[in-house]
């Protein structure tokens, strides 16, 4: 029951609501409208994490949860007990973007050569030490595993493993984990780019996309394979498959279209 968290928010006079992008997508799919059914007058901010919050998620929250709320998509990690990128109540917010780097975080995006880039996809990095940076791992006295985990990609630069973009607004867009990035024909594609298109469709409740080495007997490329869970009673027929592929192609590129 998606309404139960809003029941708590109303009963407790909640001011800050932490949730996930997947929860926001799920309650949008069932057309939940807390703004009409609950008293959320005390609610000042909503934080979304766990996966990228798509622009349509921003639209839904402001239309059907609360119009005068700070909606902040945030991203960091358990290992740093913090966020590299988060919200700022004093700054503008743009749909589909994370507002800014966290305090004390020299967050940036590097291309494959280790050069900072704007408006293009690359690796999310932190270029300087930060207050909550772990200094090592247990049972790793020489620090080999620690360095391999964070500093192997770029010398003396923390590479967090997120495929991201720094925008012209100094905000950030995260497209997924780097190790889950698809690479058909040598083109890097973030999984969130495909999820955003597929999950727009009313027929689709959930989706999972993978990259499969292809052909199996002598892999020379990666093919994109998409799994979908439909609303109860629906069937994945040729017409729906064609529509899914059409939506992806029209809103991204032919490279994003699943082979299967």
What feature does the model see in each segment?
Residues 10, 17, 130, 135, ...:
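AMP-binding/adenylate-forming catalytic core of the ANL superfamily
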Residues 1, 22, 253-260:
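Short, intrinsically disordered, charge-balanced linker/junction segments flanking boundaries
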Residues 91-97, 148-152:
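Short, P/G- and charge-enriched loop/turn segments at secondary-structure junctions
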